Amino acid sequence: MIKSKFIVIEGLEGAGKTHACICVQRILKENNIKNVILVRQPGSTPVAEKIRKLIKNNTYIEDFEKETELLLMYAARIQLVKKIIQPALKKGTWVISDRHDLSSLAYQGGGLGIKRKLINKLKYLFLQDFIPDLTIYLDVYPEIGLKRASKRNHLDRIEHRSLTFFKKTRASYLKNIKLDKKIIKINANLNIKIVTQNIKNQILKWLQQKVV
């Protein structure tokens, strides 16, 4: 039996992360891994969900400082990791997360311009060496992702940002995934059926490696 794992799905708005999380959970269960939970960042605990609303609400008359946004993201992340993710892993439950710390490097780092060194210091200060066992990065062009996101009923504060912001965020993603061999890049610009099959192929290949 494979030890419980922490799997993260990353990508821009409209990349299909929610669908991918459900897809990965289904694949795991089809391969006799029954104890699997889904979480999202920020969110998935009472405190973290309140922080999520604070971050995403676009009705505030006061703009967020970029450092404020980063710290709020990490406050929610720490709460989720300590309260839900780590306890679940210790009990043998697999965890699939919609976003993790790579999002902060991409959004607050690449998009908002906070230095990578500062973000990493914050990460190691509170989460030490806690890292995902596997990250799937769904790569989508910002123009395509935002068009998909715009079909939703309501765009949040971050989704309202400029195309330039998301281009910088994607560039940061592409730069950072080259530094981590545990990150798998999947083209999310394609038809959802093709993307789903590619996700399945990568997960099955990864599971085989873990069994061996």
From Swiss-Prot:
<dbReference type="InterPro" id="IPR039430">
    <property type="entry name" value="Thymidylate_kin-like_dom"/>
</dbReference>
<dbReference type="GO" id="GO:0005829">
    <property type="term" value="C:cytosol"/>
</dbReference>
<protein>
    <recommendedName>
        <fullName>Thymidylate kinase</fullName>
        <ecNumber>2.7.4.9</ecNumber>
    </recommendedName>
</protein>
<comment type="similarity">
    <text>Belongs to the thymidylate kinase family.</text>
</comment>
<dbReference type="GO" id="GO:0004798">
    <property type="term" value="F:dTMP kinase activity"/>
</dbReference>
<dbReference type="GO" id="GO:0006227">
    <property type="term" value="P:dUDP biosynthetic process"/>
</dbReference>
<keyword id="KW-0418">Kinase</keyword>
<dbReference type="InterPro" id="IPR018094">
    <property type="entry name" value="Thymidylate_kinase"/>
</dbReference>
<dbReference type="GO" id="GO:0006235">
    <property type="term" value="P:dTTP biosynthetic process"/>
</dbReference>
<dbReference type="Pfam" id="PF02223">
    <property type="entry name" value="Thymidylate_kin"/>
</dbReference>
<dbReference type="InterPro" id="IPR027417">
    <property type="entry name" value="P-loop_NTPase"/>
</dbReference>
<dbReference type="InterPro" id="IPR018095">
    <property type="entry name" value="Thymidylate_kin_CS"/>
</dbReference>
<keyword id="KW-0067">ATP-binding</keyword>
<keyword id="KW-0547">Nucleotide-binding</keyword>
<keyword id="KW-0808">Transferase</keyword>
<feature type="binding site">
    <location>
        <begin position="11"/>
        <end position="18"/>
    </location>
    <ligand>
        <name>ATP</name>
    </ligand>
</feature>
<keyword id="KW-0545">Nucleotide biosynthesis</keyword>
<dbReference type="GO" id="GO:0006233">
    <property type="term" value="P:dTDP biosynthetic process"/>
</dbReference>
<dbReference type="GO" id="GO:0005524">
    <property type="term" value="F:ATP binding"/>
</dbReference>
<comment type="function">
    <text>Phosphorylation of dTMP to form dTDP in both de novo and salvage pathways of dTTP synthesis.</text>
</comment>
